[in-house]
């Protein structure tokens, strides 16, 4: 009887989506707020565009840097916790074995079922530490490239979002008219972005 291999498809781009949401939402709102405020003060679409693009440049740098630092902090936190787990495995192995047993018992396994698993895991210190990181602390090993990818994704999404409220100011010299279209474009973009 022929068998078809079981293939599971899981969504694995959660971090990238999070970065896009962070960058795009700020990119839509901050330049719009700046353009709306300036429209009340000046009637020159060119001045508003200049200020808007300056804000997009500064905002994308700040947001990208924030994403970079957050991802680096996550990686540093993971590394320090991993070192602590290795230390605990080396210095208090019985306590760590009990913690492993409690984790498996929380899934309904009996003490007799858990004992060989704990024994096998305790012979592999690196796997043991990784297991504790994931199941005791709830930490996943971060991608070493994550900081740069996060920075670029957030900054790019900020720029893309920021262009939307400024686009009407590029299309018309009348700042008041541009503000109306900018508000509509921003609201529609926020609705679509929030819906997706």
Where are the regions that the model predicts?
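Transmembrane alpha-helical segments of integral membrane proteins
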Residues: 164-165, 180, 184-196
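Hydrophobic alpha-helical transmembrane segments
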Residues: 20, 48-53, 148-155, 179-184
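Residue-level signature of catalytic and energy-coupling elements of molecular machines
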Residues: 26, 65, 114-117, 158
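Helix-coil boundary and interhelical linker segments in multi-pass alpha-helical membrane proteins
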Residues: 36-51, 166-178
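Alpha-helical transmembrane segments and their lipid-water interface positions
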Residues: 29-33, 62-74, 126-130, 134, ...
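Residue-level recognition of pore/gate-forming positions within transmembrane alpha-helices
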Residues: 55, 59, 158, 186-190
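Transmembrane alpha-helical segments and their cytosolic interface motifs
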Residues: 16-35, 141-167
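Cytosol/matrix-facing amphipathic helices and coiled-coil assembly/linker segments
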Residues: 1-12, 16-18, 72-154
């Amino acid at each position: 009887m022929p068998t078809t291999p079981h293939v599971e498809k899981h969504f694995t781009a959660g971090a990238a989506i999070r970065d896009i949401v962070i960058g795009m939402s700020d990119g839509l709102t901050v330049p719009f707020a700046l353009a709306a405020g300036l429209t009340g003060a000046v009637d020159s679409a060119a001045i508003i565009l200049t200020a808007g693009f300056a804000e997009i440049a500064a905002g994308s740098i700040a947001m990208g840097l924030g994403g970079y630092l957050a991802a680096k902090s996550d990686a540093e936190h993971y590394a320090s916790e991993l070192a602590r787990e290795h230390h605990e495995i080396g210095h208090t192995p019985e306590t760590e074995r009990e913690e492993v047993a409690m984790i498996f018992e929380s899934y309904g396994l009996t003490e007799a079922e858990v004992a060989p698993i704990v024994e096998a895991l305790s012979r592999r210190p690196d796997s043991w530490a990784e297991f504790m990181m994931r199941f005791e602390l709830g930490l996943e090993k971060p991608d070493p490239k994550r900081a740069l990818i996060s920075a670029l994704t957030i900054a790019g999404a900020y720029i893309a979002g920021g262009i939307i409220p400024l686009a009407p100011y590029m299309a018309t010299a009348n700042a008041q008219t541009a503000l109306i279209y900018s508000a509509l474009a921003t609201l529609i973009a926020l609705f679509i972005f929030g819906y997706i």
